[in-house]
Amino acid sequence: MNPLIAAASVIAAGLAVGLASIGPGVGQGTAAGQAVEGIARQPEAEDKIRGTLLLSLAFMEALTIYGLVVALALLFANPFV
């Protein structure tokens, strides 16, 4: 394998995971903060807020997992060879 292609694949894999983690990380922090604020204002709605929060966190985490899948494909099933 060409060393330049191997180096580019490793760099691209790192960027894929890193950039795919930034957005969901910020979103999860914001969502958790807003959920805590909502529970503090309306303690009786805690179950509904918690359920919605956990579902939305799972959807946000899926974006990071997609970035990981792309990185693994670049590293082990190298499409550039």
Swiss-Prot record:
PANTHER family: ATP SYNTHASE LIPID-BINDING PROTEIN, MITOCHONDRIAL, ATP SYNTHASE SUBUNIT C, CHLOROPLASTIC. One of its GO terms (cellular component) is proton-transporting ATP synthase complex. It holds the Pfam family ATP-synt_C. F(1)F(0) ATP synthase produces ATP from ADP in the presence of a proton or sodium gradient. F-type ATPases consist of two structural domains, F(1) containing the extramembraneous catalytic core and F(0) containing the membrane proton channel, linked together by a central stalk and a peripheral stalk. During catalysis, ATP synthesis in the catalytic domain of F(1) is coupled via a rotary mechanism of the central stalk subunits to proton translocation. Key component of the F(0) channel; it plays a direct role in translocation across the membrane. A homomeric c-ring of between 10-14 subunits forms the central stalk rotor element with the F(1) delta and epsilon subunits. It comes from Pisum sativum (Garden pea). The record marks 61 as: Reversibly protonated during proton transport. The chain crosses the membrane at residues 3-23, 57-77. This is ATP synthase subunit c, chloroplastic.
